[in-house]
């Protein structure tokens, strides 16, 4: 038998042993080759002398498939505003491509699609001071907006743990009555007990603005049994989570037409839905705030883990099949006459 075919038989025996656990005796019997002949081939290794050495690329079982790489590039071009980590988790959630963030980064870098990173200062606070569950602490603040020819005030109540905007309104003024009515509407979103009071009583955190120290605002909190914590004067970083959400919303408002109050309310309602339900938040492990607020965070993480594991398994099978052949045997007619 020519050395080339001897080599193919040897590769088939090794592959059958590695992939199926078959001993050489069983594989050789299936191929119709006497064991004595096979071991003589091994001793002589004629194929090693007859064939030039070939540089063989090591098999990378979990390398991203060509179709996965293309899917990443297509998705990245459709969403140039997303960075690689958020891009990776969005594609997992939407079943576009189940790849790790580091793999997505390498694919984008090879295609020169990685945006330069702008370092932003992080507003930090002690771990012991942070909320550890939904409805433990709400943060509130006002953001001034220009609508048409007038000035309005966007007030937001955000769950600190989940980064979920519980309630928002566009106010005509920043007086105590307006903010107290907004606070009442936010508190009404909480589930109630038999006594009519909220079953959960989040602490309300605000700055020391006149609207948040007004008698009307404090009275609403007291009526519902909610505590009030005011941050230190001139320390807006203590309200960092809501300040960051305002920056995100301002960026999203660029290019939007806020010609009148009704149009502005529609735009803000749409952006708040996007922020709560679609935007993946890095501090939440790239989960949408609503998923965490509703207590479905671990369920979503488990879905992601399962998708990644399944994709990894499929990738391994396909890569091994492409580089090693789908069957461990050579054609029977090529070895009929050893």
Predicted region positions:
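Residue-centric detector for conserved, function-critical "anchor" positions
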Residues: 1-33, 42-57, 63, 71, ...
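Residue-level signal for the short linker/turn that defines the boundary of a DNA-recognition helix
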Residues: 21-23, 82, 99, 259
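Basic, flexible linker segments flanking DNA-binding modules
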Residues: 39-137, 235-236, 293-297, 302, ...
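C-terminal domain-tail junction helix/linker
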Residues: 58, 222-224, 248-338
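Mobile-element integrase/transposase regions
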Residues: 97-98, 102-158, 164, 177-201, ...
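Short hydrophobic alpha-helix segments
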Residues: 168-169
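Acidic/histidine-rich, metal-coordinating catalytic segments
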Residues: 193-213, 239, 287-290
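RNase H-like polynucleotidyl transferase catalytic core
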Residues: 200-208, 222-241, 257-261
